[in-house]
Regions:
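N-terminal loops that bind phosphate or other acidic moieties
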Residues: 2-134, 138-380
Length: 380
């Protein structure tokens, strides 16, 4: 075996994709010292997406001062690549859940304003191409905060300017984009998301994700009503119907809320990464792909990171073995086309024990070593 590609997603809550790949690489080097190993950090639009891109593209990291979800000053960073032409921005760095203590989370009051400030900073530096990863947000403002930071105004029925927070979506009566940053006209945005939820409704942004952002049942209904109302206002002003667009409900409606006002497109995060980093070219000459994530289950089959990796492996006729901290729906995963689906736990443990970073890395190393030892016996 001459070439193995390591394309691991993060084991969420335990170990990031980079450290997982390092543990796997160590095991392979010990068993197959002459094997070429290519580490390929992976994410699906959620946490780690921009980190994976910045790492692989050797991005220049820049910092700027913006506002957090409650409009408090915060310092953030993002990546610049392609000789300053492209900015890679993680939405969560300015308005992510980890920025707010769990007992203070309230998507009625939070805003994406800081993300718009990051974009404005990148525009000043000359960037005109953007990749924005929109997973892990603490917001449900449909992106009006970001747009306000870029010059848009959202007015109520009395022409009063609204604060760009979730509870005010229901009050939006007019949208004024006459002062939108002129550099946006020559800019393009790729919005990388990891979900396909519509803008509103039972499967929409508020009902599915607002509870984990701190909303109670009444607030969920209010937020959903706000999204319904705002979608109608957008349709009246732009003639674009975002109501049932797949992915429009990502990041509290930001997925759909940006499309009518920016030169933007929604893409699966894994597709963005695989295309941007030319994963297919890397895989074409490989003998094996090792991949994995914290939990392998039915979600794995639904357009997430490993699904994208598997599709490339099948196209290039390269076997794909998936490792998971926990494995459910093994038969469904096998039917997807994985060569093998393996749990890394050597014996029953509590979830808390299983999530310990060192334990996870040891288990990855041990499992990869066993996989490689089996392969060695059949490739002599």
């Amino acid at each position: 075996m001459k070439k193995i590609v390591l394309a691991f997603d993060s084991f969420k809550g335990s170990v990031g994709s980079f450290e997982i790949a390092k543990a796997a690489e160590k095991a392979i080097q010990e068993e197959l010292p002459d094997c070429q190993i290519i580490r390929f950090p992976i994410a699906d639009g959620g946490e780690g997406t921009t980190e994976a891109l910045c790492s692989a593209l050797h991005a220049q990291t820049v910092s700027c001062r913006v506002h957090d979800p409650f409009m408090k000053p915060i310092e953030v960073s993002y990546g610049i690549v392609n000789n300053g032409a492209m900015a890679i921005i993680e939405m969560a760095s300015a308005c992510g859940l980890p920025l707010i203590d769990s007992n203070r989370r309230n998507p009625m009051k939070t805003t994406t304003y800081g993300v718009g400030e990051m974009v404005a900073d990148a525009l000043k530096r000359g960037c005109r191409e953007f990749i924005i990863g929109i997973g892990g947000s603490a917001t449900n403002d449909a992106g009006i905060g970001m747009l306000k930071a870029l010059g848009a105004r959202f007015l109520d029925s009395g022409n009063g300017e609204l604060e760009p927070v979730g509870e005010n979506l229901i009050k939006v009566h007019q949208i004024d984009i006459s002062q939108l940053n002129p550099a946006l006209k020559e800019s393009h945005f790729t919005i990388a998301c990891d979900v396909s939820n519509p803008f509103f409704g039972e499967e929409g942004a508020a009902y599915v994700y607002a509870p984990q952002k701190g909303a109670n049942s009444l607030q969920v209904i209010e937020l959903d009503n706000g999204l319904r109302h705002y979608a109608q206002v957008i349709k009246e002003y732009t003639n674009m119907d975002i109501s049932q667009l797949p992915g429009a409900g990502a990041a509290g409606g930001m997925g759909g809320g940006l499309l009518p006002f920016l030169n933007a497109e929604l893409q699966s995060g894994i597709e963005v990464i695989l295309k941007t980093l030319r994963f297919e070219e890397v895989v074409r000459q490989a003998d094996l792909i090792l991949t994995g994530e914290g939990k392998l289950d039915h979600q794995t089959c639904m357009g997430k990171a490993l699904d994208g990796i598997l599709r490339v492996g099948e196209k290039c006729q390269v076997p794909v073995i998936a490792l998971g901290g926990a494995v459910e729906a093994t038969e469904a995963l096998n039917r997807m086309g994985f060569t093998a689906v393996l749990p890394i736990q050597p014996f029953p443990v509590t979830l808390e024990e299983a999530m310990q970073p060192e334990f996870t890395k040891e288990n990855i190393e041990r499992t990869v070593r066993q996989v490689v030892r089996i392969i060695k016996q059949f490739t002599k």
